[in-house]
From Swiss-Prot:
It holds the Pfam family RRM_1. This is Serine/arginine-rich splicing factor x16. GO terms for cellular component: catalytic step 2 spliceosome; nuclear speck; nucleus; precatalytic spliceosome. A zinc finger (CCHC-type) spans 116-132. Residues 130-141, 149-166 have a biased composition (Basic residues). Residues 104-113, 180-197, 210-221 have a biased composition (Basic and acidic residues). PROSITE patterns: RRM (PS50102), ZF_CCHC (PS50158). It is found in: Nucleus. The lineage of its organism: Eukaryota, Metazoa, Ecdysozoa, Arthropoda, Hexapoda. It comes from Drosophila melanogaster (Fruit fly). Residues 86-103 have a biased composition (Gly residues). Residues 81-113, 130-258 are annotated as: Disordered. GO terms for molecular function: mRNA binding; RNA binding; zinc ion binding. GO terms for biological process: mRNA cis splicing, via spliceosome; mRNA splicing, via spliceosome; regulation of alternative mRNA splicing, via spliceosome; regulation of gene expression; regulation of mRNA 3'-end processing; regulation of transcriptional start site selection at RNA polymerase II promoter; RNA splicing. Highly phosphorylated. May be phosphorylated by the serine/threonine-protein kinase Doa.
Length: 258
């Protein structure tokens, strides 16, 4: 049995959020028998794999470091944690905490001087206490909040624009409906408001003048029409002599022949 169980424990970093235990068992099981596999969920992105033999763990580190694991190019190396009293394995590497990386509880605070942070590469603290990581999280949260506020403003503007357009369309429709109704009824569109009397009934229009009234007016005023008629009359009528008849002319002609 090895003096430090961390010699058999392998840290797997730079994993995606969708890494599964079965996938890690399949990949690392090709190098030897496994004791346990633990995947971090809060925060995600790393895992610990413990082998039965330290030699198998070293072979897995040499063969898988920088290779694609669970769809991501992973970083594989031996865990740097010391032997823990709980027997859960070494802490170290990638924010496993002082207690254990294979499902053990986090017991420490900021870590020891020989602990390595896999976020910034520095020593003396764990990844979950890394300042650079917290700064990145704050930037992500700020950008997400700004994007949400921008999308909300766009939605409110679009809703107000559609409401105003619908209101204007409704008012135009009501106006056109009123005008059409008046045209169909006929009475409302023909007569204006000042042509209605106090009771609301429409005053009937005056009847048109008759033709003979126009002629009488022309005669009285001496219009050109009456003058032309008087000029066209025969001279006998103007002198006051009675008009000749056809019978009289024929009788005079017969007497002259005799």
């Amino acid at each position: 049995m090895s003096r430090h169980p961390s010699d058999r424990k392998v840290y797997v970093g730079d994993l995606g959020n969708n890494a599964r235990k079965n996938d890690l068992e399949y990949v690392f099981g090709a190098y030897g028998s496994l004791r346990s596999v633990w995947i971090a969920r809060n925060p995600p992105g790393f895992a610990f794999v413990e082998f039965e033999s330290a030699r198998d763990a070293a072979d897995a580190v040499r063969g898988l470091d920088g290779r694609t694991v669970c769809g991501r190019r992973a970083r594989v190396e031996l865990s740097t944690g010391k032997y823990a009293r709980s027997g859960g394995g070494g802490g170290g590497g990638g924010g496993g905490g002082g207690g254990g990386g294979l499902g053990g509880r986090d017991r420490g605070g900021g870590g020891r001087g020989d602990d390595k942070c896999y976020e910034c590469g520095g020593r003396g603290h764990f990844a979950r206490h890394c300042r650079e990581r917290k700064a990145r999280q704050r930037r992500r949260s700020n950008s997400f909040s700004r994007s949400r506020s921008t999308s909300r403003r766009r939605r409110t503007r679009s809703k107000s624009g559609t409401r105003s357009r619908s209101r204007s369309a409704g008012s135009v429709g009501r106006r056109s409906g009123r005008s059409n109704g008046r045209d169909e009824n006929g009475s409302a569109s023909r007569y204006s408001d000042h042509e209605r009397n106090g009771s609301g009934a429409v005053d009937s229009p005056p009847p048109p003048k008759r033709r003979y009234e126009d002629e009488d007016d022309d005669r009285v005023r001496g219009s050109p029409r009456s003058r032309s008629r008087s000029r066209s009359a025969s001279p006998a009528v103007r002198r006051g002599s009675p008009p000749r008849r056809r019978g009289d002319s024929s009788a005079s002609r017969s007497v002259s022949r005799d």
